[in-house]
Amino acid sequence: MPKHGKRYRALIEKVDRNRQYSIDEAAALVKDLATAKFDETVEVHFRLGIDPRKSDQNVRGTVALPHGTGKTVRVAVITKGDNVAAAEAAGADVVGGEDLIDRIANGFMDFDAVVATPDMMAQIGQKLARLLGPRGLLPNPKSGTVGPDVAGMVRGLKAGRIEFRNDKTGVVHAPIGKASFDPSNLSANYRALLSALEAAKPAAAKGVYLRSAYLTSTMGPSIPLTLSAQAQA
């Protein structure tokens, strides 16, 4: 069991482990627990009642957080033709076609997200799948990063659209803002994510879907959240 310092032990005493907090209570408390010298990211962790070994029970989706994540997202766009100008006008940080594919293949990784038009996916799959796939950066229609509307995809990512998916233990981890956010904005982002997660419930998943949820900041202890009966149905 890892040993925690005096600062962390003092923080964890502020969390009542024998109760579950509403998101509004937790959003206010997490700000009090974020005492690091930087603006900590606030994350939520959902444990799902799924069998992640079965492909028909895996959960994946996207959600536009109404107040964004507080992070500046650097977006790379792989496209060609008129879409180049459209991507640049939408605020993409780097845009290119085969030239950008080659740059990335040669080590260029100065971006946080990659979007592409369908006509570039064959080359991306051939040259970049092994590089971007393990990093979670490979464009995919399910994550809203492949499509004809490059401007819309770029604006969505810049505005705070995030992708969520379960890990191999059936847990979804997702950022919902920064410790500097107003608690009401953290709560609104959480509710948007919760709604998207409920909508993404696999038909093959039986029993209680949302088993538990915790709110935490980068350096702070986790706060157990209450889940309504409706959310667990």
From Swiss-Prot:
Keywords of the record: Repressor, Ribonucleoprotein, Ribosomal protein, RNA-binding, rRNA-binding, Translation regulation, tRNA-binding
Record protein name field: Large ribosomal subunit protein uL1
Family of the protein in this entry: Belongs to the universal ribosomal protein uL1 family.
Pfam families, per the entry: Ribosomal_L1
Superkingdom per UniProt: Bacteria
NCBIfam families, A to Z: rplA_bact
Gene Ontology biological-process annotations: regulation of translation; translation
InterPro entries, per the entry: Ribosom_uL1_bac-type, Ribosomal_uL1, Ribosomal_uL1-like, Ribosomal_uL1/biogenesis, Ribosomal_uL1_3-a/b-sand, Ribosomal_uL1_CS
Claim: Nucleotide-binding is one of the keywords in the record: no
HAMAP family per the UniProt record, alphabetical: Ribosomal_uL1_B
Known function: Binds directly to 23S rRNA. The L1 stalk is quite mobile in the ribosome, and is involved in E site tRNA release.
Subunit structure: Part of the 50S ribosomal subunit.
GO cellular component, one term: large ribosomal subunit
PROSITE patterns in the cross-refs: RIBOSOMAL_L1
One GO MF term: rRNA binding
SUPFAM superfamilies: Ribosomal protein L1 (SSF56808)
This protein's record includes keyword RNA-binding: yes
